Curated annotation (Swiss-Prot):
The gene is rsmG. It is found in: Cytoplasm. It comes from Burkholderia pseudomallei (strain 1106a). It catalyses: guanosine(527) in 16S rRNA + S-adenosyl-L-methionine = N(7)-methylguanosine(527) in 16S rRNA + S-adenosyl-L-homocysteine. This is Ribosomal RNA small subunit methyltransferase G. One of its GO terms (molecular function) is rRNA (guanine-N7-)-methyltransferase activity. It is an enzyme of class 2 (transferase).
Length: 232
């Protein structure tokens, strides 16, 4: 056994992850059924399995995946409630399916579409859709600025969200044509992105900026909602 192997932390059991998820969801005010918790844990296992080959995330430890990916994604759920129980959402630059897969599990009445330009990531997303039996989840590969409502995607979206896609101004510029009337763009950010906000294009403005607290995560997190003149 090598020194590195001796120092490697033990892999958390499913029971440990389940307890962490239950406590975290409760702290966030997100109600999850047993089936939803099970699906989220299955997703962590799937992400860890495929990550070895597809390099979906720099995080390798399932416990940290649950904190930094699952709980982080769940933290935005309470703030999306204004869009109702049956909204349509687009996750841009979804990568390994974050936050879109988590939203599809936590909000089963929503129709969630994952978007990425990398085919191997879309392949994983489709695998997650199949294995987790997420009938409300769709996958579309391609650049977001080229997606056409009624052709590449069924229609415009009430919510367009991104977790780690681009500068806020670029995100808004590239995705604004896909926002439905009354809809908005939501960007998950780390530190407060004041400089990015200052570069927002004409017709776009911050509706609200929410400081998020993610259980077990010692990092600054913000959720920015941007509204557009043409979507009002």
């Amino acid at each position: 056994m090598t020194v590195q192997q001796r120092r490697r932390p033990p892999i958390a059991s499913r029971e440990t992850l389940q307890a962490l998820l239950s406590e975290g969801a409760q702290a966030l005010g997100v109600a999850l059924s047993d089936a939803q918790r099970s699906a989220l844990l299955d997703y962590v296992a799937l992400l860890a399995k495929w990550n070895a080959v597809y390099n979906l995330t720099a995080i390798r430890d399932p416990r940290q995946m649950l904190i930094q990916h699952i709980l982080d994604s769940l933290s935005i759920v309470p703030h999306l409630g204004a869009h109702g129980a049956a909204a349509a959402a687009l996750d841009v630059g979804s990568g390994g399916g974050l936050p879109g897969v988590v939203l599809a599990i936590a909000l089963p009445g929503w129709r969630v579409t994952l978007n990425d330009i990398v085919h191997k990531k879309s392949a994983f997303q489709n695998q997650a859709k199949a294995e987790l039996k997420l009938g409300n989840l769709s996958v579309v590969t391609g650049r977001v600025e080229t997606l056409r409502p009624g052709a590449d995607v069924p229609a415009k979206f009430d919510v367009i969200v991104s977790r780690a896609f681009a500068d806020l101004a670029d995100f808004v510029t590239l995705a604004r044509h896909l926002v439905a009337p009354g809809g908005s763009i939501w960007a998950m950010k780390g530190v407060r992105p004041d400089e990015e906000i200052g570069r927002l294009p004409d017709g776009a403005r911050v509706k609200q900026m929410i400081r998020l607290t993610v259980p077990s995560l010692d990092a600054e997190r913000h959720l920015i909602e941007v509204e557009l003149d043409e979507a009002i």
